[in-house]
């Protein structure tokens, strides 16, 4: 068959398109054939435009589900009261249901910073004072600048020295010092109060001891004019909201695993720190795994599993986030399902 005959038989049209699957906005060229098929070039990923012949079933992506569930407590647009801006970064990825519920129950309006992207990151990068600090910390600067641009009344990022101690066998439940104290860095580098007239509130709190938690939050919220009784009621509601969120994650992870076992599907526990569910931080690794037809669960599935690891691991188990990863690794290693594997993000 002559080349001219082939070209005539397979006539096609071309199109230039912009992929809106993320903020990169890749320029994609499409070749559309008469039989309804298409071929794409210029795409840097296969999230929207791809040339796969057989589209396989995507796996469950619990990173995406966790992100949506975490930030489902956002204040309604018509809410009144002082606007409390909360940056979407670091320790907020652990306790946002608590803080969102607390402030709303006290009559404040919660304003969450925008989702992470390169544009948001670049708005704060000039205020980063240490180049060797971790990327999640650098990203916090962009989130704070986003809240400043949106004109909130106050910005809130607390000193959380201790997280909840989830296991009695663990030595302690310290937070990473960067996660705990980054409010002080923001105050020094951006100076929201001095330069923009927006105070940055950073009360010292501990989730390890509920009595101390209530005392410290009462002292802080009294300063904002909230009555004592309302404060204590709000804290109770906030603790319930946080626990409901954690319980939902655990149930969902175990359910995904059970469903996968029933159909002999592969499951990867993508163990990570809370802020790794930010798509910009984890580079959509979870999405890439799910695109291969593999179910992705989080370390939350092992919340009440694998506590015996503390007597065997050769490490000082005093850090809240790594303690969970130790438990998750031990649980996956001991699990009887042969298609359950673990990947850790660092």
What are these regions (language model features)?
Residues 1-346:
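An N-terminal assembly and electron-transfer interface module characteristic of large anaerobic redox
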């Amino acid at each position: 068959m002559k080349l001219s005959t082939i070209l005539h038989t397979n006539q096609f049209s071309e199109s230039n398109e912009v992929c809106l699957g993320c903020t990169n906005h890749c320029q994609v060229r499409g070749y559309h054939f008469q039989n309804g098929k298409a071929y794409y070039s210029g795409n840097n990923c296969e999230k929207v435009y791809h040339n796969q012949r057989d589209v396989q079933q995507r796996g469950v992506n619990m990173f995406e589900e966790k992100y949506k569930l975490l930030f489902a407590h956002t204040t309604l647009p018509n809410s009144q009261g002082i606007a409390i801006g909360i940056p979407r970064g670091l320790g907020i990825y652990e306790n946002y249901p608590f803080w969102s519920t607390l402030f709303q129950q006290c009559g404040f309006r919660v304003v969450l910073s925008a989702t992470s992207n390169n544009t948001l990151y670049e708005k704060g990068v000039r205020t980063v004072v240490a180049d060797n600090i971790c990327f999640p910390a650098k990203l916090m600067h962009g989130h704070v600048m986003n809240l400043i641009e949106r004109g909130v009344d106050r910005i809130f990022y607390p000193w959380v020295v201790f997280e909840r101690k989830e296991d009695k066998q663990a030595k302690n439940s310290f937070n990473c010092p960067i996660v705990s104290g980054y409010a002080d860095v923001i105050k020094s580098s951006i100076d929201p109060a001095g330069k923009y007239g927006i105070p940055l509130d950073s009360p010292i709190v501990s989730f390890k001891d509920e009595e101390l938690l209530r005392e410290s939050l009462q002292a802080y919220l009294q300063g904002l004019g909230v009555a004592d009784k309302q404060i204590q009621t709000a804290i109770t509601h906030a603790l319930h909201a946080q626990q409901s969120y954690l319980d939902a994650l655990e149930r969902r992870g175990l359910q995904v695993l059970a469903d996968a076992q029933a159909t002999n599907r592969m499951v990867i526990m993508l163990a990570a720190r809370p802020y790794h569910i930010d798509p910009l931080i984890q580079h959509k690794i979870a999405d890439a795994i799910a695109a291969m037809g593999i179910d992705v669960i989080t370390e939350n599935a092992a919340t009440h599993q694998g506590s015996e690891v503390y007597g065997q691991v050769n490490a000082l188990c005093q850090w809240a986030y790594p303690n969970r990863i130790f438990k998750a690794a031990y649980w996956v290693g001991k699990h009887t399902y042969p298609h359950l594997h673990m990947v850790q993000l660092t």
